[in-house]
Amino acid sequence: MNPYYNESAFLQDLAILVNTDSGTGTVEGIDKIANFMMKKYADLGMWTEKKTFRADLGPCVEARNHPKSKEIDLLLIGHMDTVFPVGTAAERPLTVDGNRVLGPGAADMKSGTLLCTCLAAFVQAERPELKLCIAHNCDEEIGSPSSDAW
């Protein structure tokens, strides 16, 4: 049994992410995902910050376990946007088909985004001395024009 990963809980959380439209520029959906991720990290005792570089693309999320340190030992980077238009989440919500999990953004990259919370839980419990920084951007699918400098 892995104390940092529970498949049932992971799939429940993944359904929230996948069933939220978050195509690049879908600010409401990206903001919902950003808030969800920030709560997950805050629940682990991490510092979080929402960063908006362009209002029309939505926020990015930064989470750290040693926020006062300028050094980073472990950097996890991902994105919250997808290529799918508004309405796709309702048309194709998360489904589990045997060992396959399907839905808009399930593989790229909402499962990876959520997996960062499992890795953060591990670091917090097992290697708290490591300076962990997690960055989720809002515009990767169009080349990260607003978050690139971050």
Spell out what each predicted region is.
Residues 2-104, 125-128:
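Acidic/His- and Gly-rich active-site-bordering loop/insert found
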Residues 109-150:
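Acidic/histidine-rich catalytic neighborhood of metal-dependent amide-processing enzymes
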